[in-house]
Amino acid sequence: MMRLRGSAMLRELLLRPPAAVGGVLRRTQPLGTLCRRPRGGSRPAAGLVAAARLHPWWGGGGRAKGPGSGGLSSSPSEILQELGKGGTPPQQQQQQQQQPGASPPAAPGPKDSPGETDAFGNSEGKEMVAAGDNKVKQGLLPSLEDLLFYTIAEGQEKIPVHKFITALKSTGLRTSDPRLKECMDMLRLTLQTTSDGVMLDKDLFKKCVQSNIVLLTQAFRRKFVIPDFMSFTSHIDELYESAKKQSGGKVADYIPQLAKFSPDLWGVSVCTVDGQRHSIGDTKVPFCLQSCVKPLKYAIAVNDLGTEYVHRYVGKEPSGLRFNKLFLNEDDKPHNPMVNAGAIVVTSLIKQGVNNAEKFDYVMQFLNKMAGNEYVGFSNATFQSERESGDRNFAIGYYLKEKKCFPEGTDMVGILDFYFQLCSIEVTCESASVMAATLANGGFCPITGERVLSPEAVRNTLSLMHSCGMYDFSGQFAFHVGLPAKSGVAGGILLVVPNVMGMMCWSPPLDKMGNSVKGIHFCHDLVSLCNFHNYDNLRHFAKKLDPRREGGDQRVKSVINLLFAAYTGDVSALRRFALSAMDMEQRDYDSRTALHVAAAEGHVEVVKFLLEACKVNPFPKDRWNNTPMDEALHFGHHDVFKILQEYQVQYTPQGDSDDGKENQTVHKNLDGLL
């Protein structure tokens, strides 16, 4: 693959419009030539605004919904509060860098040495860099910052800061995202130093976003894993409200501190692998991880010691027994790391040979990295309470010691103390959702980009969560929900949708299996609505949403494929579309159907197939009130005209009720084909 050199080359490649499916509608004119700015004026050319707003490169996702739809107040003080008070302003950073004795920054070297070539042995990459630089300087090719400005400004010369922040939030990013620190610092500085503090012109806007332009461009192009994040969060909110009505269950009371939580607490937080965030309910209330820490410490152990070493001491099979049973497998090992016996043994493997204080600090630092440095705390009251009421766990510990399940030289009582400490680590729904997203993202924290866990550790952890993570309910959960998850007696459910997102659902009332009643209901409803189940077919799924797809793009591709097949006379392609239950009467932006196109081109076989096999309506009118018969007559295709004329006599219109319209399409297509 050719090496890309310099930002100008990246801009050149990104700004090239994509070719349509099958080679149709391929644009030969670069986007930049359509977007030139008129001389002698400060307002952007209409072409540039239209291109920035409508061009498929942006995906239509840059429009802000305005301050009235969840946006911010336009007052500078409230905007400053929204942007946060953390971080070092750019001016202070410069002063710190210019302290006496500090070495000056190295001068940038040349981009390419003369005569340097790419992987194919030519200098195409260097020429593209030069061409891109020249086009940007001449104004022929708008920069990414320009396109982003015009996308949000929608024809205005200045952007209100609150409008930019509202548009940013609609993509799922937060102003507190560490990846946007430079942008937020510059916005804070701009609001403090400019007279027109709540408005950004193009130059100020470019200055603010240029440090994070790649992430912002990706967000506004709707290139995140969930493109239409606002629609997805509305579904999450509906599922939350539905689960909130569940009133069963009982708050765990065998650990006194847990019994103090209100049964009405209920929160859900989502974090995708791209760092899109959404929270609803009591998501900032700290609670203890309890058993939800078991997969996390297992992942740490495998990351540090490897799979083979860890599983010398613990098995991989579901036990089929209660999580706190005194029972081992036929090899005298705990069945898996998700039951108490297995978790105690895994605890003994972490940082062997050091004292408990250092071990605890090590695990806390690890969990902080997984949570993207969001809240991870410790409840000493819960720790003391659990230690005082931990007779069953002490019994398990002595049984494990008798069976020589620990590494040689292990202090069993000290390990149980460490075990109780880890169960008493506190999180919120928001920080735990980032931990789950780190597992979903292959071990990379989505909001810091830091590698935390090895792929091996993540894979093994998710496998065990899938088979053993929900106590005695694990088999049913794997059957109905089909996703890796781990529950805890504090009421949390750590849910992972691999390669998509992580979630934390928290509600203290538990069912008889020890799982959160509201959390289980939410997970069931989520998989019923979206095709997240591990065995949902992504190509031929039933009536389920796929948040990973962008609905508009799929409809556009469907229409293009259908009309292009009719244009080229490809009956075999049309047969495939009909068998896949595609609507053979769908229209383009001119209200033209496949029958219009086939009649205009004179494709007799296509017309016969659409009429006889698919039983499409022969009377559709386009925006000029032309029917397929008018098209055939206009272009002199008399054989097609005759077929349409004969079919119109025997055609019987069918009802268009919404209920069963899709089934009607399927049966109509199948009956005709058979």
Curated annotation (Swiss-Prot):
**Residues binding substrate:** S291, N340, E386, N393, Y419, Y471, V489
| Stretch list, region Highly mobile activation loop | 320-327
Q: Sites of the modification N6-acetyllysine?
A: K316
Instruction: Write the Enzyme Commission number(s) for this entry.
Output: 3.5.1.2
Alphabetically, which GO biological process terms does the record hold?
chemical synaptic transmission; glutamate biosynthetic process; glutamine catabolic process; intracellular glutamate homeostasis; protein homotetramerization; regulation of respiratory gaseous exchange by nervous system process; suckling behavior
What parts of the sequence cross the membrane?
A: none
Supply the InterPro entries for this chain: Ankyrin_rpt (IPR002110), Ankyrin_rpt-contain_sf (IPR036770), Beta-lactam/transpept-like (IPR012338), Glutaminase (IPR015868), Glutaminase_EF-hand (IPR041541)
**What cellular component GO annotations does this protein have?**
cytosol; mitochondrial matrix; mitochondrion; synapse
Which positions bear Phosphoserine?
Answer: S657
ANK repeat windows: 590-619, 624-653
Composition-biased stretches, type Gly residues, lie in 58-71
Q: Where is the transit peptide?
A: 1-54
Q: What is the top-level taxon of the source organism?
A: Eukaryota
Q: Which family does it belong to?
A: Belongs to the glutaminase family.
| Domain remarks in the Swiss-Prot or TrEMBL record | The C-terminal ANK repeats prevent the assembly of the supra-tetrameric filaments.
| Quaternary structure (record) | Homotetramer, dimer of dimers. Tetramer composed of 68 and 65 kDa peptides in a 1:3 ratio. Can assemble into higher oligomers (in vitro), but the physiological significance of this is not clear. Interacts with RAF1 and MAP2K2. Interacts with ATCAY; the interaction is direct and may control GLS localization, negatively regulating its activity.
Return the protein name.
Glutaminase kidney isoform, mitochondrial
Provenance organism: Rattus norvegicus
- Recall the taxonomic lineage recorded for the source organism: Eukaryota, Metazoa, Chordata, Craniata, Vertebrata
